[in-house]
Design a protein with these regions (language model features):
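Conserved Rossmann-fold cofactor-binding substructure of NAD(P)-dependent oxidoreductases
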Residues: 77-94
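Rossmann-fold cofactor-recognition segment
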Residues: 64-80
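Flexible N-terminal pre-Rossmann segment of NAD(P)-dependent oxidoreductases
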Residues: 1-21
Length: 129
């Protein structure tokens, strides 16, 4: 049987030279993950809908001495297929690759019986998630 090591500490350079995209990076789990990834050496691409929030996370990462992050504002709620293609091209041009993605952006919508769920809200939730 394998021993469970609950005291594991990731090496400081665990993500050195990795390029990671974090959606929903402006606050909450996305913000915390982006900061921690950078602390472990990753170049983080901060993606979210609110540029001001992304800029704050950017500043926190730089102040902590992490690799210079990048900001990519995008609102999934209104994003089109062209927006996604443009994003892929821009990221490829700037970085040449992605080593990982944390798709953290999400929208819950209402907790209600399915048959009572508003179809427009359903579409909105599916677009973001």
């Amino acid at each position: 049987m394998t021993e469970c090591k609950i005291d594991y500490q990731a090496p400081q350079d665990l993500l050195k030279d990795r390029i990671l995209l974090v959606t929903g990076a402006g606050d909450g789990i996305g913000r915390t993950a982006a900061i921690e990834y950078a602390r472990r050496g990753a170049t983080v691409i901060l993606l979210g809908r609110t540029t001001a929030k992304l800029e704050k996370v950017y500043d926190e990462i730089e102040a902590a001495g992490g690799p210079q992050p990048a900001i990519f504002p995008l609102n999934f709620e209104g994003a089109t297929l062209k927006d996604y293609h443009d994003m892929a091209e821009a990221l490829d041009k700037e970085f040449g690759r992605l080593d990982g993605i944390l798709h953290n952006a999400g929208q819950l919508g209402r907790i209600t019986p399915f048959e009572q769920y508003n179809p427009e809200l359903w579409d909105q939730v599916m677009q973001v998630n």
